[in-house]
């Protein structure tokens, strides 16, 4: 018979209320003069890789074949309205990746989940509602997700990284 262990973390508040949906703010350093690392793609993996490189003191250079998240909106609308697909800017290519214009739900099928709390904190730091930290089914929302993605890019730029759109790596 197997023994099941439960690892439980508890925060105790005595004579005070727990803070509502607090999140950890990451202090990203200026990496303008640090060694450069090329990141191909500005989807979720590329954006989070770039932010992690900044945390580690490296300067990310993000190269994305599609357009920025707000310019993509027009191209995606053309797909629905005019049935015209831009091969370089559509649901698959562009800042934010395939999920940028999805329903905004945060979901993974991966069995190797990694540090989900840190990912949610990064989203909160960049404009997502802190409620995603405690929701059973976190949801940023279609209306907010493009702004969150843009804020992530702005953090990369503010810290000295670079982001190039409409640039292929052939």
Label every PLM stretch briefly:
Residues 1-170:
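Residues forming the flavin
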